[in-house]
UniProtKB/Swiss-Prot annotation:
Domain of life of the organism encoding this protein: Eukaryota
UniProt protein name: DNA-directed RNA polymerases I, II, and III subunit RPABC1
Record keywords: DNA-directed RNA polymerase, Nucleus, Transcription
Keyword Signal: no
Subcellular localization, as worded in the UniProt entry: Nucleus
Family to which this protein belongs: Belongs to the archaeal Rpo5/eukaryotic RPB5 RNA polymerase subunit family.
GO terms classed as biological process: transcription by RNA polymerase II; transcription elongation by RNA polymerase I; tRNA transcription by RNA polymerase III
One Pfam family per UniProt: RNA_pol_Rpb5_C
Record flagged with keyword Transcription: yes
Subunit structure: Component of the RNA polymerase I (Pol I), RNA polymerase II (Pol II) and RNA polymerase III (Pol III) complexes consisting of at least 13, 12 and 17 subunits, respectively. In RNA Pol II, this subunit is present in 2-fold molar excess over the other subunits.
Length: 211
């Protein structure tokens, strides 16, 4: 079926972007997973989504951070087109059982207001982020108009502020809801280094504080 073919392609593309995203956040992802071609995805997961081959739940990802293997994160692909509070509770139950506090939820069409509220209520014990499938069809950081973003460590931020004798409040800002900030999972108070090509200087670097 043409619908199955299109849906399989979408699921492969979305999962690929998610793997790139968690890899760019410093989580461990095997290179063959990052490079997985569509045909290999079909062999591994199936090519008939209409028959639950794959079911979205088959695509669940669990990754550990490069710097701290205890820092693990789930990526869930719920079956429900619109996510309600029941799904959020089931996700938190699974996180609790495995002692994992971070997760990304990939939603098909959206979330109910009560589900969104419950995500806010569960922070900071459970840090849940959500992305629409449509947002993950392309990797925003690969767009030619998006400059390179490098997330600074707390030490690098302190060094930057000391070097230029600045306070946080004096840095230019980037909103936490900015698409690139969301891609990197940035939190308020973090600083990102933005590197743009420059005809005169080779490259032009700016710093932004997440607010």
């Amino acid at each position: 079926m043409a619908d199955d073919e299109l849906e399989t392609y979408r699921l492969w593309r979305i999962r690929k972007t998610v793997l790139q995203m968690v890899h760019d956040r410093g989580y461990l992802v095997a290179q063959d997973e990052l490079d997985q071609p569509l045909e290999t995805f079909k062999v591994q997961y199936g090519d008939r989504p209409s028959e639950k081959k794959p079911a979205r739940s088959d695509l669940t990802i669990l990754v550990a951070h490069n710097d701290d293997p205890a820092d693990q994160m789930f990526v869930f692909f719920p079956e429900d087109a619109k996510i309600g509070i029941k799904t959020i509770k089931a996700i938190c139950q699974q996180m609790q059982e495995q002692n994992i506090s971070r997760a990304i939820i990939v939603v098909q069409t959206g979330m109910t207001p009560s589900a969104k509220q419950s995500i806010g209520d569960m922070a900071p014990k459970y840090m849940l982020e959500h992305f629409l499938e449509a947002e993950l069809m392309v990797n925003i950081t690969e767009h030619e108009l998006v400059p390179e973003h490098v997330v600074m460590t707390a030490e690098e931020k302190a060094e930057l502020l000391a070097r230029y004798k600045l306070k946080d409040s004096q840095l230019p800002r980037i909103q936490q809801c900015d698409p690139v900030a969301r891609y990197f999972g940035l939190r308020r108070g973090q600083v990102v280094k933005i590197i743009r090509p420059s005809e005169t200087a080779g490259r032009y670097i700016t710093y932004r504080l997440v607010v």
